[in-house]
C-alpha cells in the first residue's frame, strides 16, 4: 500500500469515526483541537487504525500521535 493510499484510508477512517467532512481534514489537523476529538474518540480512532492496517500501536506511541500527518507517518513507517 502506498503512502497516498494510506493517507486516503486514514482520512476515510477519520470521517467515519469522527463525523467530520473530508474537506475539514488537513495533514496538520490536530485530532483534539481541530477535529473535536475527545479522549474516547482518540482511543477508538487508534483502534480502528490498528484494525485497518494490521499494526499494533502501543499506548506510549499513541500518546504521541496528535495530528493526522503523525498518524499517517506512523503507519507508513510500520508497513
UniProtKB/Swiss-Prot annotation:
InterPro entries associated with the record: ACP (IPR003231), ACP-like_sf (IPR036736), PP-bd_ACP (IPR009081), Ppantetheine_attach_site (IPR006162)
GO biological process, one term: lipid A biosynthetic process
GO cellular component entries: cytosol; membrane
Alphabetical keyword list: Cytoplasm, Fatty acid biosynthesis, Fatty acid metabolism, Lipid biosynthesis, Lipid metabolism, Phosphopantetheine, Phosphoprotein
Residue numbers bearing the O-(pantetheine 4'-phosphoryl)serine modification: 39
GO MF, any single term: acyl binding
Location(s) in or outside the cell: Cytoplasm
PTM: 4'-phosphopantetheine is transferred from CoA to a specific serine of apo-ACP by AcpS. This modification is essential for activity because fatty acids are bound in thioester linkage to the sulfhydryl of the prosthetic group.
Pathway the protein takes part in: Lipid metabolism; fatty acid biosynthesis
Ranges for domain Carrier: 4-79
Entry similarity comment: Belongs to the acyl carrier protein (ACP) family.
Underlying gene: acpP
Top-rank lineage group of the source organism: Bacteria
SUPFAM superfamilies in the cross-refs: ACP-like
Keyword DNA-binding: no
PANTHER family cross-referenced by the UniProt entry: ACYL CARRIER PROTEIN (PTHR20863), CARRIER DOMAIN-CONTAINING PROTEIN (PTHR20863:SF76)
Function in brief: Carrier of the growing fatty acid chain in fatty acid biosynthesis.
Name this polypeptide is given: Acyl carrier protein
